[in-house]
């Protein structure tokens, strides 16, 4: 699953994502290698601790991040939060949280993009496109599986932000007037 809907009201959409089964399985597998190496080796206690600690470090490094997206119409903002256990351990609890805040009015489109996933092939991610031309992924990592799972989330966001509605004739005439008044058209 790409993201889960935590809450959905007319003014607030809260989406969450936690590490998946593949990520947790990899953590348990790598940590098991370290524990087995420590248990079956005839080395000193220091080396055994090194085996377990090293494998724990590699296992946590491969763990996916916890991510959430909060679209709030009452504040007019979207908050994208990311929590990384790996960064939290590296900085000794000083970092680990990333947060991006964007105005809802700046979002112009929501797309699904295909991304190459190392070792596994291709995955899909929802991308928010802004009026400035800048784009930002909804999550930091793509999800493997069916594109339709990711498209459901993209459609949910598009519907919530009412981006699917066509421009009114007044907005169309204003945009064509502003194009005609551009400085390059003057003679």
From Swiss-Prot:
Q: Which domain of life is it from?
A: Eukaryota
Annotated membrane topology? Single-pass membrane protein
Where is the chain membrane-spanning? Answer: 20-42
Q: What is its main location?
A: endoplasmic reticulum
Pfam families reported in the protein's UniProt record: Cybc1_Eros
Pull one GO CC term from this UniProt entry.
Answer: endoplasmic reticulum
Biological process (GO), any one: innate immune response
Report the InterPro entries cross-referenced here.
Cybc1 (IPR027846)
Localized where?
Answer: Endoplasmic reticulum membrane
| Phosphoserine modification, residue list | 168
Keywords from UniProt, A to Z, are:
Chaperone, Endoplasmic reticulum, Immunity, Innate immunity, Membrane, Phosphoprotein, Transmembrane, Transmembrane helix
Q: What does this protein do?
A: Functions as a chaperone necessary for a stable expression of the CYBA and CYBB subunits of the cytochrome b-245 heterodimer. Controls the phagocyte respiratory burst and is essential for innate immunity.
Q: How does it assemble?
A: Interacts with CYBB; CYBC1 may act as a chaperone stabilizing Cytochrome b-245 heterodimer.
Which family does the entry's similarity section mention? Belongs to the CYBC1 family.
Q: What is this protein called?
A: Cytochrome b-245 chaperone 1
- Origin organism is Bos taurus
What is the gene called?
CYBC1
């Amino acid at each position: 699953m790409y993201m889960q809907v935590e809450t959905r009201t007319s003014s607030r959409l809260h989406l969450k994502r936690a590490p998946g089964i593949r990520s947790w399985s990899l953590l348990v597998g790598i940590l098991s290698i370290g524990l087995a190496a420590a248990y079956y080796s005839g080395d000193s206690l220091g080396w055994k601790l090194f085996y377990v600690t090293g494998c724990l470090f590699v296992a946590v490094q491969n763990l996916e991040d916890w991510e959430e997206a909060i679209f709030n119409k009452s504040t007019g903002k979207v908050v994208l939060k990311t929590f990384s256990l790996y960064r939290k351990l590296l900085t000794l609890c000083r970092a680990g949280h990333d947060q991006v805040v964007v105005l809802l009015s700046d979002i112009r489109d929501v797309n699904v993009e295909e991304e190459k996933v190392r070792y596994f092939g291709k995955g899909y991610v929802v991308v928010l496109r802004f009026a400035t031309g800048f784009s930002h992924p909804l999550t930091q990592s793509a999800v493997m599986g069916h594109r339709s799972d990711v498209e459901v989330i993209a459609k949910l966001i598009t519907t919530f932000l009412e981006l699917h509605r066509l421009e009114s004739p007044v907005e169309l005439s204003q945009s064509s007037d502003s194009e005609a008044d551009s400085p390059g058209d003057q003679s």
